[in-house]
Amino acid sequence: MQCYTELLPPSGVTHAISLPFLSATSNNLIVAKTSILQVFSLVNVAYGTSAPPNADDKGRVERQQYTKLILVAEYDLSGTITGLGRVKILDSRSGGEALLVSTRNAKLSLVEWDHERHGISTISIHYYEREDVHSSPWTPDLRLCPSLLAVDPSSRCAILNFGIHSVAILPFHQTGDDLVMDEFDEDLDEKPEGASNIPAQAAVANDTTMYKTPYASSFVLPLTALDPALVHPIHLAFLYEYREPTFGILYSHLTTSSALLHDRKDIVSYAVFTLDIQQRASTTLITVSRLPSDLWKVVPLPPPIGGALLIGSNELIHVDQAGKTNAVGINEFARQASAFSMVDQSDLGLRLEGCVVEQLGTDSGDILLVLADGKMAILRLKVDGRSVSGISAQLVSEKAGGSILKARPSCSASLGRGKVFFGSEETDSLLIGWSRPSQSMRKPKVESADDVFGDHSETEDDEDDIYEDDLYSTPVNQTTLSKTTSQTNGLNKDDFVFRSHDRLWNLGPMSDVTLGRPPGSHDKNRKQSSSRTSADLELVVTQGKGNAGGLAVLQRELDPYVIDSMKMDNVDGVWSIQVGAPDSTNTRTSSRNYDKYLVFSKSTEPGKEQSVVYSVGGSGIEEMKAPEFNPNEDSTVDIGTLAGGTRVVQVLKSEVRSYDTNLELAQIYPIWDEDTSDELSVVSASFAEPYVLIVRDDQSLLLLQADKSGDLDEVNIDGILSSHRWLSGCLYLDKYHTFVPTKGQDQPLSDNILLVLLRADHTLFIFSLPTLTEPLCSVDGVDLLPLILSCEPPPKRVTYRETLSEVLIADLGDSISRQPYMILRTANDDLILYQPYHPKTSLDKPELRFVKIIDHFLPRFDPSPKAYMPHSKFLRAYSDICGYKTVFMSGSNPCFVMKSSTSSPHVLRLRGEAVSSLSSFHIPACEKGFAYVDASNMVRMCRLPSNTRFDNSWVTRKVHVGDQIDCVEYFAHSEIYALGSSHKVDFKLPEDDEIHPEWRSEVISFMPQLERGCIKLLSPRTWSVVDSYELGDAERVMCMKTINMEISEITHEMKDMLVVGTATVRGEDITPRGSIYVFEIIEVAPDPDRPETNRKLKIFAKDDVKGAVTAVSGIGGQGFLIMAQGQKCMVRGLKEDGSLLPVAFMDMQCYVKVLKELQGTGLCIMGDALKGIWFAGYSEEPYRLTLFGKDNEYLQVIAADFLPDGKRLYILVADDDCTIHVLEYDPEDPTSSKGDRLLHRSSFHTGHFTSTMTLLPEHSSSPSADDPEEDDMDVDYVPKSYQVLVTSQEGSIGVVTPLTEDSYRRLSALQSQLVTSMEHPCGLNPKAYRAVESDGFGGRGIVDGNLLLRWLDMGVQRKAEIAGRVGADIESIRVDLETISGGLDFL
């Protein structure tokens, strides 16, 4: 009874495509990350300096233009995406094109953008995994066969090649076609609505439309029906410039094989077929035979080039429409592997396996090749008329940006205007721009960042500051980004220059993971601090391949970088004040306008608060006397500035006080009811130049406006505003005209002030100031929290409603993109985010709607008295916290609401205790930082940590090493990380081999490459390498572990040692050998300039063994280790002379991939890559390894670990099919044969290739169990709970959590309800996605935590209905969801 929850989505990009998706004129990028589908728009921004020396004759300044990616929508699909295609359909809802998504097991989903829902809408889904298609006994399983999606450039049909020989053809209706929907053969055709229609697109109002769906009936054919010679297809793609759908295909009549090259040389053929969809026939146009056997891809080329480019491992071949070929060999093996006629360019020495091809523009024959190591090459096709007369290749130099990509790209998408996107699973995905040096003297008309995003007050002109705050732009490389000529950089005028515009971070592939301790708190007064601001542990994973290798440091909560801190008693609030000069109107736009005052509110007695004012200067903060500042010791509600920063307004409980820039009293405005003369109190306040909104305790409103002199005057409120009661309200400056359309270029910003109010009956009103007579919009039933908030009336019969406490509309984003969001806070501190949008239904008066943002934030319940905060206003917006526009929620669940240009809004917790107040803080020592007060009365001045990303609910930092990191281990005693890295080196056959004397005469310059390992020490204080140990030729690190070992047989001294297992592999026909290293990390005198270099590696023991050392672990309590060497598992101990003495062993079968011990028990598991998992035990008297049980399924083990659950012992196993299996050792079960057989309880398909499994430290399943102040006699025993952390090659992180019987029943029933009651993106079934076909064990399956968390996305009424069907209440389900999504409090 377990639950799998994905904590971090995959980040490696697998597929990408560009198309006009949101509208007919838009340019969108669609990105697939295994199971995540993201929609991006593009925006051009310009950076530069306004210094006069860079100005031209007219005083204009040329600024560097960048294209940035802006995330529009993101969807988690219940399937693994295998292909994307663009289809132009008739009468799309957006006016743009539709997207065709292929997923694993032969499924096609056709989706389009729906402006009514502000999201994707599934037109249809088509299934082709029918049994009759795969009835042949020798046909491989469908899940083992890759699928290929190809779409006709004219959108007449799409082909899905699946199951090796099967193709599904899906026609699409186009203007003028003669397809008939009503005529189809039921024995051969699919139904006209497809296998499913979710929902079918409604019939359009145009009477001339003759089709109900944009597609016709699809059908499945074997490839041999098109041509009997298509026995072994390799690759196919549709071609351009044909009247009918025409595709080119690579195939062979025999299976290609490098080992049989002498007999199967040049057996590949290329053919072009034209499809007649109506007759289901094909016509062969051309056939080119005797092609090289290493061809693997067809790349269609648009006009004017036309034809197709065939890519092989050693050559490139162009085939035009008439079958004429031109070829070039790019390494010396091209001549040896093929007799095909080609131009010799073997001096390039390129390896084309896994390369990506993209055409540079449509008016030339230049093609960009990105190789597997990230290097770039330009392929030039010499065009003579409409035919290609020659082909040549040239590498791109580093000066021209040829080394921008560090590893192999997985896909590419041309975005037009000199922009190409390269997605990668091995490094960051890049948006790259290209140009020629001859164009550098041109000055293109670009938009500045100010023109794109509106008012200049939130942007900076200083170039250094811009790049410091722009967390998502690539740092400027003066070599490749400066405007150069051939005289300055040595480039020819026809060469291409590449530069990076934007990037999508990738945390994969995660090959290893460890838990380490942060280097320590940055708090200067750490001894005075009574609360933690740094994590106990941090998660460190390896990421990247090749030159892109490095580490990623992950934390679940935000650890602020503390500049300074101090202890103050009875502090309730903190506010920073930034004032402006009275004679200047542009002062506030300067980035150097620091805060002048810092105000603290201190409780003196009930109902009384003292305002303590500090003066902020370059030397720090000093307390100052301000006798006129709140002399009556009234409670402060909020503090802000008006009149261009010349008036400081302090809103107190009983009055509003206005001060000048020196905090001298200028005005007092009382808070009282003019009609009854009753004294009222202020509940909350909101500022927006020149207004201040006040909500009083009788739920009435007071709106004040500052005149030109700064004096406050009351704005007359009539009608709705005066006759109703209001729960909450705020003011919002609509800079970007999201709510109110633009009225003119000269419209002042004061005309864009919105008054947002939440009525007592939870009706939302939005007014556009100064108009207060009629609301801009009103939304009923906000407390129902539906997916879409609109002006339509809610359902009449509603039983359940949410208790809302606060509403706020604020901008969220970074320096690239900022968008307004409405944030609702409930009485339980739940945060619900809505994004405003216009559905484009009426152009005269656009309707305003709000769509709910998906974020599964669950606040923690803190029963302690410190968690109680007296202030009623918990949400506060900030315009610039280290470059972010963000919202902070104070209270017992302190958190930021963050958003970047490439991510959706999400909640990020602030580590530590409850926070009573937080304010922005901008001084020279803490630029664009923040100051906050926690429940322990500790005041901290902080900044967000540098070089850190906040794109998701985890705080992420990447450390670039430059080599591929295969293993990582934390050495706790020395507080340092040990890395097992590798880099490629040329391999040459040994000349002294006596068995193969012919190797001595081998003459070759294009060497094969092998991995050579290196062991490095990395300091977490500076994240730099402090020591390294180079391994031998062809020797690489296979495993690494920190083990507490006995280093002396006499004294029995125990010490932590670093144990490394290696393998020396020189070829498949040479037996591999291995070595076991035992290192001691010693302390040495550091380099004076680098104090972190005080650690060195010292070899304590080394032993060469037969067979590779593939896994190692500690075992028992005597300081021994167990290692897998070849086909044996052996227990060894250290001797006095530094040798390793074997004491016990066990014979294995093939290749031991996993070897782990349940710490301190002697129980261990041994995972064979081909023969399943073994469960054994180690005894010390006598030394012996005993096999207890093993599985009978022969699982292909990739990763495994223990999962204790009370008195039960489970073993989790991840196989090569992205599936997690749950095994149990239960000798009392009759079906286990007295324990000899591990019981297979359940299976769960994750969709990701699991790389590691890690048993996390135990934690209490109940918060009260960890409270040391509780009396042990009064608290029931709460068992410790374990979790297993799962990482993947795609960069995702998940956790497997054991469940109690009651929780499992509730969540299992809830999962069944959600599968049938929710609409799923692309129409994919979550239950079918997670199920395993061979899962016939009858056990209880693993529940899907991500599907269960979608229950939180529902409206309140819908959640209650689903909970009622399950037989539970809302609170019990929330507790269960907190269990499956939490537990990692130490990170």
From Swiss-Prot:
Family statement: Belongs to the CFT1 family.
Positions with biased composition (Polar residues): 474-491
An individual GO BP term: mRNA processing
GO CC, any one term: nucleus
Function noted in UniProt: RNA-binding component of the cleavage and polyadenylation factor (CPF) complex, which plays a key role in polyadenylation-dependent pre-mRNA 3'-end formation and cooperates with cleavage factors including the CFIA complex and NAB4/CFIB. Involved in poly(A) site recognition. May be involved in coupling transcription termination and mRNA 3'-end formation.
Composition skew (Acidic residues), residue ranges: 458-471
Gene Ontology MF annotations: RNA binding
InterPro entries: Beta-prop_RSE1/DDB1/CPSF1_1st, Cleavage/polyA-sp_fac_asu_C, RSE1/DDB1/CFT1/CPSF1, WD40/YVTN_repeat-like_dom_sf
Region annotation Disordered: where it falls in the sequence: 440-493, 509-534
Keyword RNA-binding: yes
Protein name: Protein CFT1
Keywords recorded for this protein, A-Z: mRNA processing, Nucleus, RNA-binding
